Amino acid sequence: CIYPMYDFAHPIGDALEGISHSLCSLEYEIHRPLYDWVVEHSQSMLPARPRQIEFARLNMTRTVMSKRKLRALVMGGYVKGWDDPRMPTLSGLRRRGCTAAAIRDFVSRIGLSKADSTVDTALLDACIRDDLGEKAARVMAVLHPLKVVLTNWDADKTLTLTVENHPKHPEMGSHTVTFGRELYIEQEDFMEVPAKKFQRMYPGFEVRLNGAYIVKCEGCKKDENGNVTEVYCTVDMDSLSGSEGADRKIKGKTLHWVSAADAVPFEARLYDPLLADDSALEDETEPTAEDAVDAEETEEAEEADANLSRADYDFLKKLNQHSLTVVRGVIEPYAKECAPGTALQFLRTGYFCKDPDSTAELPVFNRTVGLRDAFAKAAK
């Protein structure tokens, strides 16, 4: 009896399951004549006549695609499971915030080929941006907060501002934010002594606070180590967005902010590619029979360390040690109420997805993709 030898079981199983096209990687090309032979000689007994098509495996820059290497990452504790947002698994991509539409767009763009090639992850990022750019509501979140005090604003005065969820899609509605005497901005948006062409906040310079007023920086306060802890500004009361005075032209940029009065602490998980460079991708072939036996042994051991000494796993030395950075910031209350899996654009920062690890006290957001490909820029 030859059943269930793979070359016999594969076409019969496909036919019984109603498969029309069996898509395989290139190493199965030499098996196709036998696949076709079995289908041809079993046609009278099978409900369908499947066809095998081969294509080159998908390789992506700075991304581990080999199943055995991905398993080593999981079993060795280098990632937090198969759904870790750094993993190229469907569950990992979903948790990262990648949408099904973005994946379909990516697959459509790269197509099928029999030529070995490596696709830049920037293409997948672009597909994600294109999709989320149309779907994600805009919110303000500050990852590295710096307090701003508006010295000519009454301490007990607050203003409720209405902001659109999406500038191009009014049908997505709006939400409110609170404006008051104390706010938070990003630390990088202030410089006591500005660099050349710096057009954000510094003493004597005006900027606009998104959806609110034009403010002028008057000075700052430092701690004993010389670190800026507070920035002092005055408000142009006639410059509220939507009013006549809002048309006044200034040289400064528009900054995002979060009111200190109702700021919600949150955790941001900033993900970057798992590999520091592409040199670890030189051998992404599937395992031999001997490798498969080793994989079974690791399953029994419940950890990968027993096999990580093999030359196969030298790629672990080339992991990006900064593939995950966790920061604590503040975000507007609207984002706290979103359900896990909700995609948002943090203004001027990137696209984020609310993680299932979120609690009532501490929302957690995973960075899906930045507004630009910062990793590729830094690698040049």
What do the PLM-derived regions correspond to, one by one?
Residues C1-L112, W153, K354:
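Alpha-helical recognition segments enriched in aromatics with Gly/Pro capping
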Residues V79-K80, L90, R95-D105, I110-K380:
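Basic, alpha-helical terminal appendages of large translation-related enzymes
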